[in-house]
A protein has these predicted regions:
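A short, Lys/Arg-rich alpha-helix, primarily the initiator
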Residues: 1-29
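Short basic helix-loop element that most often maps to the first helix and adjoining turn
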Residues: 20-39, 64
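Conserved hydrophobic/aromatic packing and binding residues within compact polymer-binding modules
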Residues: 23, 36-37, 47-50, 76
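Residue at a beta-strand N-cap/secondary-structure junction
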Residues: 30, 56-59
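DNA major-groove recognition helix of helix-turn-helix/homeodomain DNA-binding modules
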Residues: 60-75
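Conserved short acidic donor-positioning loop in nucleotide-sugar-dependent glycosyltransferases
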Residues: 79
Length: 80
């Protein structure tokens, strides 16, 4: 008999789709991905991964997002 394990997210697991939405919100409509990536010091491809929820931003990037937006890291990660 095959044993099935149910995978649950721990409270510390980031919700990448929500983080992605908030990063897009921080970038806004005034900046292209390329422009915003340059401000953050990353490639446009990496910013795209963050904005699509395919990658979790590093602490360094979270700090840069905080500095750029004036939003807390808690807000970027949780929306609160």
């Amino acid at each position: 008999m095959k044993k099935t394990t149910q995978r649950t997210e721990s409270p510390s697991t980031p919700d990448l789709a929500s983080i992605a939405r908030r990063i897009r919100e921080i970038r806004g409509f005034d900046l292209t991905q390329g422009e915003f990536a340059k401000i953050l010091g990353i490639s446009q491809a990496q910013l795209s991964k963050y904005e699509l929820g395919q990658s979790t931003p590093t602490v360094e990037i979270l700090l840069r997002l905080k500095k750029f937006s004036g939003r807390s890291i808690d807000w970027i990660l949780t929306g609160e």
